Amino acid sequence: MQVTVNERDAVQSVATAHPAANGESHGHGMDKLVIEGGHRLSGEIVVSGAKNAALPILCAGLLTGDPVDLDNVPNLKDVRTTLKVLNQMGVKSETDGCRVQLDASRVDNLVAPYELVKTMRASILVLGPLLARFGEAKVSLPGGCAIGARPVDQHIKGLQAMGAEISIEHGFIEARAKRLKGARIVTDMITVTGTENLLMAATLADGETVIENAAREPEVSDLAHLLVAMGAKIDGIGTDRLVIQGVERLHGARHSVIPDRIEAGTFLCAVAAAGGDVRLTGVRPHILDAVIDKLREAGVSIEEGDSWLRVKMDRRPSAVTIRTSEYPAFPTDMQAQFMALNTVATGTAQVVETIFENRFMHVQELNRLGANITIDGNTALVTGVDKLSGANVMATDLRASASLVIAGLRAEGETLVDRIYHLDRGYDRMEAKLTAVGANVRRLSGSQA
């Protein structure tokens, strides 16, 4: 049966209707960050594991009854939510710092409920593994950041090609299949979570699956490397054509999550904006090529080693034009941070967003700080100004909140960033890491604010 979902309607009603309710459910209530601008940054920052690799990797624990031992897992809201979803299904998990051990030998509930899924779209990633190992799954339609339409349809079409019967009723995706069959799947758009879901499902399918137009993101490759360690047979890792020979069962494995290239890029932009000399450790520079190239174009000095980067900046940046696209091009998740950098640059630059609609919500907030940005469709025109001045601003989504922190580090006076529960979804204690290199940033908890 064919299913089409207008996912935007399902998503927007959740994401925009209750920003406050969303915030209260995030543990910290309505925390704020207070930033006093004008401090240079110097010292060392350790980059955490990648959120966008950790989430699918945690879900891959569902594919085996053996223990899966993970390291370098970031301590983030979205990770904790994913673990809650898994725990509700009967997965046992033990967390010790950055280590997480999963045991999915006694899964007894194949439903991912709305209360958990609505705060995080990545919960859709349990669909493929549950269907492949248990033959059925029921997953609530997702929520998460309020950024335009997301392509759940691609997941559904791919699983249907592998023989799954899927219906959408009462806000749930319900799927069943005796055993998935290998298939050739061509997605009509590149989708990271879609590639991950289909890749996990294919590992236990009967026969060969070919995923054409697969996402090439390093986080997809990291998931693939874990699956191979668990006994999966996958060719073409890192390319847009993944070939999977299904196996009867997967076994346990140990795996260390790759470093977060977006967190690393965010700190590079922070130093570029505030000025200073900072060493980032625990990084993989080669997966940051597009970002590093653009920073060098802006006049930033960057040295790279195997697992470190040193970033130095002692002048005003030059404006750089960026255009977001799929990996290995410039990442949409770094667009807002570069917009913040361009606000204080010399010259004028275009920022073109080709991946998500509705991803310029930070523009009016940056303009409140004195930036000069105009929007025309999917393009923002940024004319650099001599100085920004601190003001009260509000975070609207994860990367927008990072851009406001970067702008605040550069602005004169005090900037107050409200609703930073968005920031906590993707950054592990950002204010602590910035404070350690000389920034003046402090968190006000909901009660003080």
UniProtKB/Swiss-Prot annotation:
Q: What class of enzyme is it?
A: transferase
Query: What residue ranges carry the coiled-coil annotation?
Result: none
Its pathway is: Cell wall biogenesis; peptidoglycan biosynthesis
Location comes to:
Cytoplasm
A GO BP annotation = cell wall organization
**Is Cell wall biogenesis/degradation a UniProt keyword of this protein?**
yes
Which reaction is recorded as catalysed by this protein?
phosphoenolpyruvate + UDP-N-acetyl-alpha-D-glucosamine = UDP-N-acetyl-3-O-(1-carboxyvinyl)-alpha-D-glucosamine + phosphate
Where on this chain does UDP-N-acetyl-alpha-D-glucosamine bind? 121, 150-154, 333, 355
Q: Which NCBIfam families match?
A: murA, PRK09369.1
> What family does this belong to?
Belongs to the EPSP synthase family. MurA subfamily.
Name this polypeptide is given: UDP-N-acetylglucosamine 1-carboxyvinyltransferase
- The organism named in the record is Burkholderia lata (strain ATCC 17760 / DSM 23089 / LMG 22485 / NCIMB 9086 / R18194 / 383)
